[in-house]
Amino acid sequence: MSAADLVTVLAEGTFEEQIVEVSAFLSRSQPEASRNDFISKFQQLALDAEPAEPAEPAVSTEATEPASAPDAAKKQQTVQQLVSEIVTLGEGSDRELEGVYNLIFSLISSTDQQTQLVPQLLSAVSKDSAAAATGAGGADKSNVRYRILSNLFNSLEATSALRLQTFNALLSLVAANDDLDYLTSALTALPQWLAQWSVSETEKASCLESVAKALEGAEKEHGQTSKAYQFLVLHLRYISTLPASASTKEAAERTVAAALRLPRLYEFEDLLHVQAVLDLKSASSPIFDLLKIFVGGTTADFSAFASSHSSEFQRLNLSHDDLLHKIRLLDLADLCALRVSADVSYASIAKTLNIEHDQVELWVIDVIRAGLVSGKLSQVNDAFRVYKSTHRQFGKEQWQSLEQRLVQWQNSISSIIESIAATRGGKLPDGAPVAAELATA
């Protein structure tokens, strides 16, 4: 699928020739004895709609009758009748199928009935796709179905609501065949397309939800859910602009649960900026309290929640053990964030995580692997030297801590400059005046 506004499908030949070509393709599904009659019927309809130009004689002695003018209404009726005969993908090589459908797109675009005809075409192209993909009923035609729908999508106007219908049909096909990689570039462009398409906000939200569900289903099989989560959040932001409903609450709970399940996601504060998530608080949804714990709570808070809301874990398909492990890692990261460029004793870590002393190093290794902390273990000193640590949220306390560290660095620099000046008899080294000004600023 192309991100371009419009890809024009060119069709050669007269209207009659185009109709005959498509009808000949469709006649393959007819009994052999009636195929010629089928083609002749549509050829006559095409001639009635757009009479052929009379051939010029070699020597003209008298004026010839001019051809009748094309009848737009009859042309449209002919195309409508032709499209009504398309009930399945059809028979032919992939190249032939793609070419014929491009011609059909061209014929449809010449009418003002795209809104009625395109859905018929989508149904025909998608019909029996699952059976074909599994080898039942003939060769697998999945790839050519994808290309046909992609070509149709690209032939439609950038703002056309039919693009959404075409995208949904293609999404259903690739999801059924576990071929979502085919839509990688399309999913990247989807937010931009949604802004262009002339469809309602509800339809946009429904599209995002369909994408998220398709990705969830596919990624569960492969142990990945990060891309699905991105679309869950995008969907949630869309429906946050709509009137609240039971489905909004359900979507918010599903999104928060998906975030908590992600094994390498540790930052949850952004979810608290989504209105649908904030509405969970007024709806007294326990998962909002759980989210708040992972944003700024402790292992003790989590244990208290788990003891009073044990049924929530099963309802939301959450693993208590996985979440306990995650909140402990966050607790350890918080502890380390208070001691950047300093040592954290094994005893402090054991107390914070409520673990045995001999388990400390394993937890430190885990938090480093999670990307939350970097540092160096010292078995000699029974301490962990912290180089850097991430914060779950950056609020007033974190700003105050940063200010204190900057003041400490400022004082250290001033002290170093004064020491150098003293050893030089009061003369500052080159560049020191600037440093001194910074130190006293």
UniProtKB/Swiss-Prot annotation:
What Gene Ontology cellular component terms go with this record?
eukaryotic 43S preinitiation complex; eukaryotic 48S preinitiation complex; eukaryotic translation initiation factor 3 complex; eukaryotic translation initiation factor 3 complex, eIF3m
Q: Which domain of life is it from?
A: Eukaryota
InterPro entries, alphabetized: COPS7/eIF3m, eIF3m, eIF3m_C_helix, PCI_dom
Say if the entry is tagged with keyword Protein biosynthesis.
yes
Which residue ranges does the record assign to the PCI domain? 227-391
Residues in the signal sequence: none
User: Region (Disordered) spans which residues?
Assistant: 50-75
**UniProt GO MF annotations:** translation initiation factor activity
> Where is this protein primarily located?
cytoplasm
Q: What family does this chain come from, according to its entry?
A: Belongs to the eIF-3 subunit M family.
HAMAP family assigned? eIF3m (MF_03012)
Q: How does it assemble?
A: Component of the eukaryotic translation initiation factor 3 (eIF-3) complex.
Role of this protein: Component of the eukaryotic translation initiation factor 3 (eIF-3) complex, which is involved in protein synthesis of a specialized repertoire of mRNAs and, together with other initiation factors, stimulates binding of mRNA and methionyl-tRNAi to the 40S ribosome. The eIF-3 complex specifically targets and initiates translation of a subset of mRNAs involved in cell proliferation.
Q: What is this protein called?
A: Eukaryotic translation initiation factor 3 subunit M
What's the source species for this entry?
Mycosarcoma maydis (Corn smut fungus)
Which lineage?
Answer: Eukaryota, Fungi, Dikarya, Basidiomycota, Ustilaginomycotina
